[in-house]
Amino acid sequence: MAGATTAKGGARRTPPPGPPPPALKARRRLRLPRRRTLLVTGVATALLGSGVTWLLYGSSWLRVEQVAVSGTAALTPGEVREAAAIPLNEPLAAVDTDSVERRLRARLSRIADVDVSRSWPDTIAVRVTERRPEAIVEKAGKFLEVDEEGVLFATVPQAPKGVPLLQVEADRSPSSRHFGATRLRREAVAVIAQLPEKVRADTLSVRVRSYDSIALGLTRGRTVVWGSSERGAAKAKTLTALMKAVPDAERYDVSAPTAPAVTHS
């Protein structure tokens, strides 16, 4: 029997002639507004990006008007600004803060750490941490400051108050050839850091003859034989007990903290 093809027979039904269904008409009407929305959004984004770029780099606003320096002690803010070499009136966003940090470390050896950041709308902030002298080395009538790593970082005309004099006398010692001067200075500074507070305040000098031969010169002509920087906590505890038990001794030997010795004058 002839007639319309049905879904039961497996053939695709042909849509009837006439106007499209309402749902299809609605979808077609939505396409144009969506395209317009995308176009408007794209143009607005481009304009916004151009405006931000102009504001950051092309306008007279948001430019460097001052360089604020904090954290200085021996250095002055003026010295830090000069070494930083940040031009005023430059766009704040154009300042390469990493390059400024590298420049400061290279030009000012007294700086241990530095952080350079933007402080909107018109300031570059430079926060420095200076090296502290843990010991000094005398040379040609001047004094070289030694930091906690044993590095010589600055020359001063006068010895800083309360900083012990470091004497490295290991030129002919195998320790000097094996470890090097910087390592021996670092070991000496490590010993200073391990001292009891009162002993450290009384320490006038530190003498290094080799890696395991470090001695301290104290006030009132007293001497402490420390040995190497190893077992520092045990040596400090033993030294405190010895000084309490024998306060008038001239020489205290804690190089072997379990078998200390004292010498009277």
Swiss-Prot record:
Low complexity composition bias: residue spans: 1-13
Residues exposed to the Extracellular side: 59-265
Localisation per UniProt entry: Cell membrane
Pfam families, sorted: FtsQ_DivIB_C (PF03799), POTRA_1 (PF08478)
Membrane-protein topology: Single-pass type II membrane protein
Chief location bin: membrane
Alphabetized UniProt keyword annotations: Cell cycle, Cell division, Cell membrane, Membrane, Transmembrane, Transmembrane helix
Biased composition (Pro residues): 14-23
Keyword hit for Transmembrane helix: yes
Region Disordered, annotated ranges: 1-25
Coiled-coil parts of chain: none
Family that this chain belongs to: Belongs to the FtsQ/DivIB family. FtsQ subfamily.
Function: Essential cell division protein.
Listed name of the protein: Cell division protein FtsQ
Organism name: Streptomyces bingchenggensis (strain BCW-1)
